[in-house]
Amino acid sequence: VFLHGGPGGGVEPIYRQYFNPEKYRIILFDQRGCGKSTPHAELKENTTWDLVADIEKIRLHLNIENWIVFGGSWGSTLALTYAISYPRICKALILRGIFLLRKLEIEWFYQYGASNIFPDAWEKYISVIPESERDNLVKAFYKRLTSSNKDERLSCAKLWSIWERSTSKLIPMDKSLHDFQSSKVAEAFARIECHYFINEGFFEYDGWNHASCTGLAGC
């Protein structure tokens, strides 16, 4: 089963290229609120634990005894959390672009650190936020991404999404950047991602998944 990034990133056809269809039964799905899943960009009942439960429901629905779990970026966070919850169901984990949704990772990417590497993109990203609110950009964006003002919500969603997509790869993919010009794609991605970040992944404490994986073989 393939677990996409974000949260809120959705599945793309290119993700199938990781697997040989003659050898693997490839299962991809859009997590809550994004891609083809509905309701669109919904934050209610949208937590890490809801997604873990969804993965298990899919496995049971497809009558699969056990499976390999593949995830990158946020997908690696979710895969690890699922494996901690259902260790006997996972034949193996394939994780890339490891991200554990720890406070230091969020702060480095959205508050300081990455800003020194991509200063031009950073200035565009923070342009909509008043200087008085820039000490906590995740909080400032969340306020606007959950606003009843649709225009404000969508403009902030695009800035958030383009910042991440233009800086998460050394060579940004033109198609990905173009996709985030779409209000629908950007809104789901930014709202859901920011929702998870401001709630610290809905984990019991910072670094929970890293501390809890000691029971998994190979960890």
Question: Where are the predicted features?
Answer:
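Conserved HGGG/HGGXW glycine-rich cap/lid loop of the alpha/beta-hydrolase fold
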Residues: 1-39
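Catalytic nucleophile-loop/oxyanion-hole region of alpha/beta-hydrolase
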Residues: 40-52, 104-113
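Conserved acidic catalytic loop of the alpha/beta-hydrolase fold
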Residues: 49-68
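Short beta-strand immediately N-terminal to the catalytic nucleophile in serine-hydrolase-like folds
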Residues: 69-71, 96
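Short glycine-enriched nucleophile-adjacent loop
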Residues: 76-87, 93
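A catalytic-pocket lid/entrance helix-loop region that shapes and gates access to the active site
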Residues: 88-141
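Accessory cap/linker subdomain of secreted extracellular hydrolases
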Residues: 140-177
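Conserved serine/cysteine hydrolase catalytic core
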Residues: 167-219
